[in-house]
């Protein structure tokens, strides 16, 4: 995983078979290893072509971070990526195993609802900002080193979630979570209309159907030469 072009060159020089170019928008833990300066880390749109140029056509570059629909996939391919890695979208799939508290927060996800924080594990990771993150600040020098921070919080998280509260919950997702939620609700509405059913709009599309939909959207965008 490379979060800068410098890291991509290092990985290439050390014989990796492929590189995941992880933009600043990506959910979950950061893969940075040559720099700890989070403020200087590029987003996916800027990172992918620089990683592609850094390694040439010798190994594939996989784009990751903020890619939530076919438009994002098409954009990554146009920037030179050989493939994409998508995570947050699948949190909304029927097979998703995220807990009820996490699901409730995902349903109301929006574009400015995530932060990079070291509070939960001692390492920077992107997720929905809960009460703990808001009160301690997303990045704190008081946090124990990885992985001790996560162990210390487990009991608090479990007790709060038993009460349906997300105060101490690590709810990893990327900056595209709001778009993922909108797409999931649209798929749910189409399902309900087709099957004359009602119920939860999110978490009804299977991972297989989601993958097919995303691929079809991307192919349509690439075929037309525009992202609509």
Report residues per predicted region:
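Non-cysteine beta-strand/loop elements that form the S-adenosyl-L-methionine
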Residues: 17-25
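Conserved active-site-proximal phosphate/metal-binding subdomains
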Residues: 13, 29-62, 68-228
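A cross-family glycoside hydrolase active-site/sugar-binding cleft signature
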Residues: 1-2, 22, 62-64
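Conserved radical SAM core fold
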Residues: 7, 26-29
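Short acidic active-site motifs
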Residues: 6-7, 19, 72
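Short, ordered loop/turn segments at secondary-structure junctions
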Residues: 3-4, 24-25, 89
């Amino acid at each position: 995983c490379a979060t800068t072009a410098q890291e991509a060159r290092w990985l290439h020089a050390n014989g990796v078979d492929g590189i995941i170019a992880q933009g600043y928008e990506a959910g979950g833990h950061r893969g940075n290893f040559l720099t700890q300066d989070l403020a200087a880390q590029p987003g996916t749109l800027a990172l992918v072509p620089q990683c592609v140029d850094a390694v040439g056509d010798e190994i594939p570059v996989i784009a990751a971070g903020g890619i939530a629909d076919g438009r994002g996939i098409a954009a990554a391919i146009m920037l030179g990526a050989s493939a994409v890695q998508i995570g947050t979208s699948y949190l909304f799939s029927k097979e998703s195993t995220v807990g009820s508290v996490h699901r409730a927060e995902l349903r109301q996800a929006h574009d400015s609802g995530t932060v990079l924080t070291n509070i939960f594990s001692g390492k920077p990771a992107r997720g929905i900002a809960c009460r703990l993150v808001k009160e301690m600040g997303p990045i704190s020098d008081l946090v124990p080193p990885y992985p001790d921070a996560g162990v210390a919080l487990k009991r608090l998280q479990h007790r709060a979630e038993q009460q349906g509260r997300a105060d101490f919950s690590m709810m990893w997702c990327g900056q595209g979570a709001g778009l993922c939620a909108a797409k999931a609700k649209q798929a749910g509405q189409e399902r309900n209309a087709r099957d004359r059913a009602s119920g939860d709009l999110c978490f009804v599309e299977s991972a297989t159907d989601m993958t097919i939909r995303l691929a079809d959207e991307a192919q349509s965008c690439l075929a037309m030469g525009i992202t609509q």
